[in-house]
């Protein structure tokens, strides 16, 4: 086992694996990932793995859009097949006017980021 390395990533969940992946894509080779059990066997394994573009600021929308595109790219690699399906759609409910204002803000921001987001009222459901 190595006793020295440039980067140690602790945890083999989605965050740790993603960090290691992106470091290697940037050309880093002296990196090690440490996981106490099997990769993705903790919280990541229990996740429903729902990835949406929804986020209340441009940074989060951009990060989520990048993730969706990355998972699609990874699923197309015949050497490392993963089972990935990205469906279109979702439902979020507003119980207060404050929540509704948040959704209106997101809808306005989403239009500028090429993310489809539609607000419907109770009668349209």
Language model: regions and residue ranges:
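Short, flexible hinge/linker loops that cap or flank conserved catalytic cores
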Residues: 1-2, 25, 85
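N-terminal Rossmann-like FAD-binding beta1-loop-alpha1 element of flavoenzymes
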Residues: 5-33
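Short N-terminal amphipathic alpha-helix/helix-capping patch enriched in small hydrophobics
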Residues: 16-19, 47, 67
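Glycine-rich, phosphate-binding/catalytic loops in enzymes
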Residues: 26-27, 48-50
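Short glycine/proline-centered loop/turn elements that form peptide/ligand docking sites
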Residues: 40
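Conserved catalytic-core motifs of eukaryotic protein kinase domains, centered on the activation segment
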Residues: 43-45
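Dinucleotide-binding Rossmann-like beta1-alpha1 core, especially the glycine-rich loop
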Residues: 49-124
